[in-house]
């Protein structure tokens, strides 16, 4: 990925930001693209939106280091603009390789760019967020991007519903059983 020159985004960046976390995680979060802080540090979701994502994970008792977090594009779009469809398309080879290597059972799509790129170009996050979609044995949950929640805090209750739904799906699929007891079984520990 470091040598990638498939689109023009790589020309004005400090770092490519492939993603980080548990490379064997059954849960993957996919956002839009790196922001300024991520570009400077070379790590995904470490700026204000990443700090909010960490708090959202903590709210459902899921340590951040137990999931994998990445973005559709691996280079920061100028001015933090939405990646162009051709930029997202160029980066899909990297995302496909990540999902193939990690093999998540559940993917949370953070924001409309991730949902439009991976589900449907006509996807509308305000209408379709929070609805589970199963593709090739992988469950996907589109929800608001944390940066959208920072811009519009009135969406936080819906995002909280989605996080509770995520927790319930992880229980249903018997994932993170050391953290979540499956329905009807005693709590671990």
Show the residue positions of the predicted features:
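A polyanion-binding, active-site-adjacent surface
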Residues: 1-189
């Amino acid at each position: 990925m470091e040598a990638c020159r498939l689109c023009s985004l790589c020309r004005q960046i400090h770092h490519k930001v492939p993603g980080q976390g548990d490379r064997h995680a059954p849960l993957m979060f996919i956002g839009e693209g790196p922001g300024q802080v991520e570009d400077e540090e070379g790590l995904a979701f470490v700026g204000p939106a990443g700090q909010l994502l960490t708090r959202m994970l903590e709210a459902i008792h899921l340590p951040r280091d137990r999931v994998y977090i990445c973005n559709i594009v691996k280079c920061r779009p100028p001015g933090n603009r939405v990646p162009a469809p051709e930029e997202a398309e160029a980066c899909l080879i990297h995302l496909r390789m990540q999902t193939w290597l990690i093999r998540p059972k559940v993917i949370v799509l953070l924001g409309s760019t991730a949902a439009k790129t991976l589900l449907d170009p006509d996807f509308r996050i305000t209408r379709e967020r929070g609805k589970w979609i199963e593709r090739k044995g992988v469950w996907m949950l589109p929800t608001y991007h944390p940066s959208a929640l920072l811009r519009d805090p009135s969406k936080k209750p819906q995002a909280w519903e989605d996080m509770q739904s995520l927790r319930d799906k992880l229980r249903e699929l018997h994932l993170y059983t050391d953290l979540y007891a499956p329905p009807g079984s005693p709590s671990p520990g």
